[in-house]
Design a protein with these regions (language model features):
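N-terminal Sec-pathway targeting helices
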Residues: 1-12
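Extracytoplasmic low-complexity segments
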Residues: 5, 17-84, 212, 248-256
Length: 256
């Protein structure tokens, strides 16, 4: 089954960014600067692409074995590892993890189980990973601590950031968390916010090159790990610039 998402183009310098999903009237102000430089999945509507855009049908989202359940605001998408469910958006030059102004990725997530060691939330090749993670691959220390983590890489070993905020507390099951990853305009520092509060950051030796020809995947990573997830995701949003701490707090208040 293929679900197509409504697309609206937005200009940013020489590039373009697109808007996925249909904003409900009470949430129009999610685009904080009004420039339309946002990619947004609200999962409320299985909408077809009814607009003529720079990328046309090439930017339709493709849903694979997912289900839709009650979310924070309307529907949310549920990924189940046993069904190998995920959502992919084919690559297009208009889809980016940031230009000169940085990038912000925010989402609400509810984890169903601690048994999966690499619960991928989003992935775009080697550029950007965000997942729910237990650090022991051999299983010897499973459950010691679990955390949200983001790993972003560039073209060489000096382009690397890794944020995992370990406060000694396990992520609670079946509880919604609001997570934000903010790459600063210099493309060197990545910050992680949990429920509107900055928790930790990581700084790269060199600015990250965030260009990637890979598809954007939600709930799955293809390649070496080929992992699937066991979680529920709502309001997945990409801003093609760096949000401030106050703007992150505002989004958290609106989407909680």
């Amino acid at each position: 089954m293929k679900n197509r998402f409504f697309l609206i183009p937005g200009a940013l310098g020489l590039g373009f960014l697109i808007l996925f999903g249909i904003f409900t009237s009470e949430r129009q102000d999610l685009v904080l600067d009004g420039k339309g430089t946002t990619v947004f999945f609200d999962f409320n509507d299985d909408a077809v692409n009814s607009e003529t855009t720079i990328c046309g049908n090439m930017c339709n989202g493709i849903e694979k074995n997912t289900s839709f359940v009650q979310g924070i605001t309307g529907s949310a998408v549920k990924f189940e590892a046993q069904n190998e469910s995920w959502l992919t958006v084919p690559h297009h030059p208009s889809l980016s993890f940031g230009e000169e102004g940085g990038v912000t990725i925010v989402f609400s997530v509810k984890v169903d189980t601690h048994s999966y060691k690499h619960n991928m939330i989003y992935n775009k090749g080697n550029v950007g990973w965000g997942h729910f993670y237990t650090p022991s691959y051999d299983g010897l220390y499973e459950g010691e601590y679990l955390a949200f983590q983001a790993i972003w890489t560039g073209d060489d070993v000096q382009e690397y950031v890794n944020v995992m905020c370990n406060d000694g507390k396990e992520i609670e099951l079946n509880k919604w968390y609001f997570v934000a990853h903010v790459l600063e305009p210099d493309h060197k520092t990545l910050k992680q916010y949990i429920n509107g509060i900055e928790m930790c950051s990581s700084t790269s030796e060199k600015p990250l090159n965030t260009d990637s020809l890979d598809d954007l995947n939600l709930g799955h990573v293809e390649g070496t790990y080929n992992d699937f997830s066991q979680l529920t995701l709502d309001n997945f949003t990409i801003f093609n610039y760096s949000l401030t701490a106050d703007e992150i707090s505002t989004l958290y208040q609106k989407l909680s």
